[in-house]
């Protein structure tokens, strides 16, 4: 029988008289990588916040067998990487990674040897030993993303929630970060739920996709089942070519239509 460390039933979030999330049902198996896709405003970040208990919601959330757990229970089970995390510029890598131990440290004590060991292990796992004494402001975008992941790993939660983990990275660093997440998932038996805008990367890395549109689940399944030209046209308002190979979806190529072309770019004129 499959174990679902993360599950939700009829999960609904309302704000300002609007439903941001509407009766979402969710089951994520242990060790699975679930990709959340959908256009901007579809409800991906709201779903993360509802799972974390950061917004008021109705319906049922089950995490590691606990139904509608309190925020501390969720913090112990879920490590969240937001799309734009705050990085205190003068803080060192080691200090920032240690913040991942916050759910384990009570108000009346400082970090223990166990906390320090967990942070050190995360730094080593993300290959950050040489950077651990550097200030965050001196790091490149790719290095910062590894530090953010190290903080999540130091938390020792069984599930990672990643909200656009490759935002603002070039394609090389996007592949590097997602490959790193996949390695950590397999080595440490982690479950991953991530929001990904790039549909080709979502197809290549995620075991299963959940397509959200206006707060509702409109498609769910493998990349082959979800990333159809019909779905992309209906929910992204984009015509596309979906390239397939023997393993399923290989790439999603949006088509530029004539309506999008406004003014021809004039030819470059060389200086005399």
Language-model segments: residues:
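Catalytic Walker B motif of ABC-type/P-loop ATPase nucleotide-binding domains
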Residues: 160-164
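ABC ATPase NBD coupling module
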Residues: 66-80, 84, 89-91, 108-113
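Conserved ABC ATPase signature
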Residues: 135-139, 143
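The feature captures the beta-strand-to-loop junction immediately N-terminal to the Walker
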Residues: 37-39
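Conserved ABC ATPase "signature" region
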Residues: 113-131, 156
């Amino acid at each position: 029988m499959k174990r679902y460390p993360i599950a939700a039933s009829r999960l609904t979030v309302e704000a300002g008289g609007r439903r941001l999330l509407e009766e979402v049902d969710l089951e994520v198996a242990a060790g699975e990588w679930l990709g959340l896709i959908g256009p901007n405003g579809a409800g991906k970040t709201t779903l993360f916040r509802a799972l974390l208990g950061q917004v008021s919601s109705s319906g049922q959330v089950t995490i590691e067998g606990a139904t509608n757990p309190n925020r501390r229970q969720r913090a112990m089970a879920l490590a969240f990487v937001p799309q734009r995390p705050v990085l205190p510029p003068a803080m060192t890598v080691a200090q920032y990674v240690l913040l991942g131990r916050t759910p384990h440290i009570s108000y009346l004590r400082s970090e223990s040897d166990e906390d320090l060991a967990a942070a050190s292990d995360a730094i080593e796992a993300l290959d950050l030993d040489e950077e651990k004494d550097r200030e965050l402001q001196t790091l490149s975008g790719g290095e910062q993303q590894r530090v953010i992941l190290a903080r999540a790993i130091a938390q020792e939660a069984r599930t990672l929630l990643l909200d656009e983990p490759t935002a603002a990275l070039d394609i090389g660093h996007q592949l590097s970060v997602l490959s790193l997440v996949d390695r950590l998932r397999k080595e440490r038996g982690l479950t991953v739920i991530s929001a990904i805008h790039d549909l080709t990367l979502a197809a290549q890395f995620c075991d299963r996709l959940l397509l959200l549109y206006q707060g509702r689940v409109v498609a769910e399944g493998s990349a082959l089942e979800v990333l159809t030209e019909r779905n992309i046209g209906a929910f992204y308002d984009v015509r596309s070519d979906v390239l397939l190979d023997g393993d399923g979806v290989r790439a999603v190529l949006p088509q530029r239509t004539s309506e999008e072309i406004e003014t021809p770019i004039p030819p470059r004129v060389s200086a005399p």
